[in-house]
């Protein structure tokens, strides 16, 4: 088992620490998050691999919604152990794309426990999603074009 911490990005503290089998897939972790935070199971969600600064990397969606012919990595075919395996391992979990609930998911430690369970709980989910500001750094200047 591994212990992970799930933290809602909000003014209020909403934290869950959970023991989970790392051989399960991210879809299973998604279901554990939904259950422990009492979220609606019918909303879309994605995990994002991050670097040490929590900059978003590769998206791992719940379902493949792309029109690409090649196989897209989804939660179902990504083991938890491939993305959460050390103290440097962190994910961002976006739930409900209309309201953009954002959670930080981080590896805490390996555990000898044999039962999956919530080991620590702080706070409850607010009724409305936190109003987050997403900032994007521009790498290049954008030229403006005028209609002729």
Task: Please state what every model-predicted region is.
Residues 1-148:
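Short linear regulatory motifs enriched in tryptophan with gly/pro/ser
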């Amino acid at each position: 088992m591994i212990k992970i911490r799930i933290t809602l990005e909000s003014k209020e503290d909403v934290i869950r620490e959970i023991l989970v089998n790392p051989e399960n897939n991210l879809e299973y972790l998604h279901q554990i998050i939904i259950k422990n935070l009492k979220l609606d199971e019918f909303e879309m969600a994605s995990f994002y691999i991050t670097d040490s600064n929590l900059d978003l990397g590769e998206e791992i969606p719940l379902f493949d919604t792309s029109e690409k012919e090649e196989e897209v990595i989804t939660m179902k075919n990504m083991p938890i152990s491939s993305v959460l395996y050390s103290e440097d391992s962190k994910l961002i979990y976006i739930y409900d794309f209309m309201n953009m609930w954002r959670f930080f998911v981080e590896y805490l430690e390996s555990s000898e426990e044999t039962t999956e369970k919530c080991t620590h709980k702080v706070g409850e989910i607010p009724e409305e999603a936190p109003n987050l500001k997403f900032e994007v750094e521009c790498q290049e200047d954008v030229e403006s074009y005028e209609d002729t």
